[in-house]
Amino acid sequence: MDKKGYELLGDPFLNKGTAFSAEERGALGLTGLLPPHIDTIEGQAERIYQQMERKGAGIEKRRFLMDVFNRNRRLFYYVFRQHIAELMPIVYDPVIAESIEQYCEQFINPQETAYLSIDHPEEIETTLRAAAGVQSA
């Protein structure tokens, strides 16, 4: 793995948070960058779910879950899989409609968004390649 330390923790596809083992923490330069407690994904998921339950309206729960999504995709999808019937209306419809309506007020992180312009269709492929981190051919 090329990424280490904060760079690794900043990658939501690689970040496991407190689920990194002691060996992984040492090898990946994470010693001291995470709380010392080592947890399983099951323990993390239980904690995240309990924290989400304490949130108020659906939009607050969605914002919280999207924050988890932005930090740790493994954990997000693990929790989502465990509670799919309950979380689907929060992450998707109908709460996403409210989220879209309030987009300007709650814009926090573009979640690696690719911005496409209807006025420049010739840029679509270049934009999508850039967003995916793929070099042009």
Where are the regions that the model predicts?
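Metallocofactor- and cofactor-centric catalytic cores in central/energy metabolism, strongly enriched
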Residues: 1-137
